[in-house]
Amino acid sequence: MRTKLKITEGIFPMPVLMVATYNEDDSVNVMNAAWGTMQERDTVALNLTEIHKTVQNIKARGAFTVSIADAAHIVEADYFGVESGNKVADKFARSGLTASKAETVDAPVINEFPICLECRFIEYQNNEYGCGVIGKVVNVTADESVIVDGKIDMSKVNAIAFDPYTHGYYKVTERVGEAFRDGLKLKK
């Protein structure tokens, strides 16, 4: 038997993405965004409203970075979602994390998060189905601690996912299958 539930953003897992920009004074701003995905291999889509300080910064600078949050920094990642850059100018400084300038875009890389996508702002879309930032990924970097044989080993990243049903975070660490291979067992 199935139970009927209220409608919510019910896709799981939802990524916990750290979207980083520079403010007007060159200080770092970061927000926590769960509504994000890849549109193509090199295009990021983030469902963010224009009231966010981060969106204002993206439009002004033409760039942003997207990092994948990890379990070791759950407190900081959550803080970036509960505190507004419009209200707290030194939000990033209060986190205790550090940043460096991205190699290819005018945006910061949060050093403590293991994977970072450097993005060039393409456009802001606003229509009946939602609104958001579209960016072109121009560089991807990863901390050496998560690299095995020249590739990212997601079991070492300890990425976290947002649970929209109970508003919790879960660690995403165990590989359970081989994409585009396991299903071939049923193909006739």
What is the predicted role of each segment?
Residues M1-K188:
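Basic, polyanion-binding surface patches
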